Amino acid sequence: MRLLPSSCAGALSLLCSLAIAAPTELKARDLSSFIASERAIALQGALNNIGPDGSAVPGAGAGFVVASPSKANPDYFYTWSRDSALTLKMIIDEFILGNTTLQTIIEQYIHAQAVLQTVSNPSGTFLPDGVGLGEPKFMVDGTRFNGPWGRPQRDGPALRAIALMTYSNWLIKNGQFAEAKTKIWPIIANDLSYVGQYWNQSGFDLWEETYASSFFTIQNQHRALVEGAQLAHDLGVTCTGCDQAPEVLCFLQSFWNGKYIVSNINVNNGRTGLDGNSILGAISTFDIDAYCDSPTLQPCHSQSLANFKVLTDTFRNLYTINAGIPEGQGVAVGRYAEDVYMGGNPWYLITTAAAEFLYDAVAQWKARHVLTVDETSLAFFKDIYPEVTVREYKSGNANSPFAQIMDAVTAYADSYVAIAEKYIPSNGSLSEQFNRDTGTPLSAIDLTWSYAAFITMSQRRAGQYPSSWGSRNALPPPTTCSASSTPGIYTPATAAGAPNVTSSCQVSITFNINATTYYGENLYVIGNSSDLGAWNIADAYPLSASAYTQDRPLWSAAIPLNAGEVISYQYVRQEDCDQPYIYETVNRTLTVPACGGAAVTTDDAWMGPVGSSGNC
């Protein structure tokens, strides 16, 4: 046998190092090279989708994050509060890590969100009760989107507050206390008021499909309130709504069913509840200082690990591209097994989130110098380290069982990144999904969230962790949960550029109309009031068919209108296949009651011609 020399020099040194390196080391080295390259591509991809200078989104306002340049099949050329906040959280973290060129975008986002908070929309108004903060998406110039949608969505305010609190903490540490207090805190305070007031009300989940209580939403709402209480203390101000944090944490425990996390509860939609929602929630509330038995359900928590295994295993035999991949190795991961959107495919952002989840867990175990394996998490560890038993493992030398398990979990995380790498095109562009049978990218191109998710995964793999958000200091949940609420206080953040809107006295008018429609047809109410679009069909108010039945084809919307106003209105049908709108043949009128008057409900029936599907 020919032995390799103990040392090498000159041009042979690289060859020598490669020869000595184990195959797993070479594989990790190759993956590291890919991640470094793709991370730069992903950052530029995200920046290309942010106005006003983003090359892919002409027309986007300053500081507005566009979900994707795609304008058809699907049309994602809008700004979502959730996607925007997650993207800015990534950008703020990159800024804190040293990329100072990003500060202008952060400042533009702050101004854009201050203004956006005050924009009246189909979810409601900003004043007096903040209900409009639950609107999920807007046009790319920051104006209201009036189309039918899954609204409200209650994660946006919490996620925006988290992003802005991260930046505020940096400002405080860098001698800019006044900037954080006078300019940014008022935006944060509005969002935290919304969370404290509405956390216990259902809303649509992050996939905009299920009206329920969402794990991802509740987990981020709790973090926002805990972090908000600490920031308020540091700034010497009051956090309205932050007192609700223990109740939110109490409710968070309701999602565990003994085997896995049910991502949406208080709903019966025929699904198992296994959903990428639960992985995304854990990584967005990751705290490097957290204890692994924390009720915040960190990545290293036994329930989170058990859920990770059950969830990812559901996709092993579901997608053709996962065929033959054994347990303990990464697979392409989608939203949920029952998904049919665009054919129900794996998503880049969830596949990289799976890797990030595992990197997070390893970081937490290493920070605590201990790993506790219990019956709940045992199956997760068995897949990647068969010798594992139910016991406590303490950190030791490089050959200790603790170190071996850390290496095994890290390699498992890397295998998810390798799956993403396999199906990312050579130019590094990231769409929303990739085909379950062929791996070909599909759905929205250049998805901003996909780019942001790749970067946050890259940060964790590189050992770059955000500062603690205070999970250790969070008040424990009460013994018995209570569906409580704290009325919010809402004030326009004028120091950040918000208009000084005022609250007029309004009365809720519920527009009910019986109108038989076909699938794909929508109804609007339009009228002389600005809240009803001022007769401009582009600004008409969408009605909801959530209570529609065959016996009663009800379309409805509750709209606050100015007290004493005389309203002229009619209903309009929006046809499919780009067919023209169909207007009623009558004009209706009503008078809004005086200030303090009782709410009014109409009982209308469609009068006029009806449409039919264009069968496109």
Curated annotation (Swiss-Prot):
The active site is at residues 205, 208. The keyword Secreted applies. InterPro entries: 6-hairpin_glycosidase_sf, 6hp_glycosidase-like_sf, Carb-bd-like_fold, CBM20, CBM20_glucoamylase, GH15-like, Glucoamylase, Glucoamylase_SBD. Keywords: Carbohydrate metabolism, Glycoprotein, Glycosidase, Hydrolase, Polysaccharide degradation, Secreted, Signal. Substrate binds at residue 149. Residues 1-29 form the signal peptide. Glycans are attached at residues 200, 427. Residues 501-608 form the CBM20 domain. It holds the Pfam family Glyco_hydro_15. GO terms for molecular function: glucan 1,4-alpha-glucosidase activity; starch binding. One of its GO terms (biological process) is polysaccharide catabolic process. It is found in: Secreted. The keyword Glycoprotein applies. Its EC number is 3.2.1.3. One of its GO terms (cellular component) is extracellular region. Belongs to the glycosyl hydrolase 15 family. This is Glucoamylase P. It comes from Amorphotheca resinae (Creosote fungus). The gene is GAMP.
